[in-house]
Structures are given as C-alpha cells and as structure tokens.
Amino acid sequence: IHPKAEYHKRAYVTKKFVSDFNERTGNTVQYLEAPYEPNEYRKLVRGLEEEPEGGDRCKVCFDYRLDKTAQVAMDLGFDYFGSALTISPHKNSQTINSIGIDVQKIYTTHYLPSDFKKNQGYKRSVEMCEEYDIYRQCYCGCVYAAQAQNIDLVQVKKDATAFLLDKDVEKDYSHIKFTVTKLDI
C-alpha cells in the first residue's frame, strides 16, 4: 500500500474495526499485520507498471499476497487461508480464487474460495462501513493503479498523516493483536 502513511492509516482503521466488532458481538477476532515491504512488491511487478487494472500486475500482486498469507497460515497451523479481495467490484473473484487454489498446492493449508461481492455482499460491506464508521479508500493501494486513476498521492499522504497525528499505531488496540502460543504435545 502506497504511501506508507496510507498503509498505517488502513492498518489502524482495521484494528479499530476488529476491536469495535468484538465489543459489539462478543467475538474474539484477532489482528495479524503483514510487514510493510513496498520494495519487494516493486521488484515483483517491474515491467508491469503500465498494465491495466485487472491485468498481469494485479495477478502478480494476488499471487504474492496469497502466497504470504498461506505461509503464515501454515506456520500458525491454520487449516485454511483466504482473501477479502473478492468483496471489491473491481477485482475478479475467479482470478483470485484460481491463484489461491494454485498457491495451496505448495502448502499444508487449504485455500477457501470466495466471492464476497455476491448475494449483496458488496452492498453489505458498504452498510457495515457506515455502521462501524470505517474509512473506505478510493484505490487498492497500488501506486501504479493510483497513478492510472489520477489519484493525488501527495494529498493521500497528507490526509493519512493528519489522521495518524493523534494515534499511537503500536499501542492503540494492542489487545486484539494476534499472539502465537505453541503447545508442546
């Protein structure tokens, strides 16, 4: 997600949502944050910068994200991994699911195919964003997609930085951070 301040803003908003959701529902959903590695992404998509939305650059991104998710899921002993990307009307669920199914072949965890936009899923996501006061971003996070959509990344950075000014991204909502407990059996 570019710029870095936008990454931190989205992470903070996600943690707030998880905390609020748990409080309202009595659930104990936890949050696990991926490291910020924009240079790794840029290396992977080098030569694909001009690809259109949904093109080969997106496929490389989906593969990278799903592979990282599967690695973590396997390391933590989860039976399944999945993606919320399929909620977006701008993302092809069949492509994402096909990549997820390919990725699962190299791990001991399974991909859970989804199409969250179906059955009014996208509409429900908009309703939940209003209900939980969730920030809805105007682009996926890809610097190249943002540029193609003429998104003012300087303004995005300013807005995200202003949002984060009075936030402690490390301590706020630390109670929902995923913790790993290894059992010796």
Spans of model-derived segments:
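Nucleotide-activated chemistry modules centered on ATP-dependent adenylation/adenylyltransferase
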Residues: 1-185
